[in-house]
């Protein structure tokens, strides 16, 4: 059986990332949120919802966030 990993790049999404992670966990075995330099609680909320969290210290853009996620696999 194959395993599914979802990569979710995020920047200042504390108000929505929790529900996105919870919804995604229904379909994926592993959810990784790449916090792209957020200045809010995005990383904390994502972790509380059950995601693994990778962090960029500053915003580098969606492409860089996805690259970080793919490199973590």
Identify the residue ranges that each predicted region occupies.
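Structured catalytic core of nucleotide-sugar glycosyltransferases
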Residues: 1-73
């Amino acid at each position: 059986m194959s395993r599914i990993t979802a990569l979710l790049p995020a920047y200042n999404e504390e108000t929505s990332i929790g529900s996105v992670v919870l919804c995604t966990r229904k379909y994926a075995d592993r959810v990784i949120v790449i916090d792209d330099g957020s200045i809010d609680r995005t990383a904390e909320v994502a972790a509380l919802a059950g995601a693994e969290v990778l962090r960029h210290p500053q915003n580098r853009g969606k492409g860089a966030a996805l690259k970080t996620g793919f490199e973590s696999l």
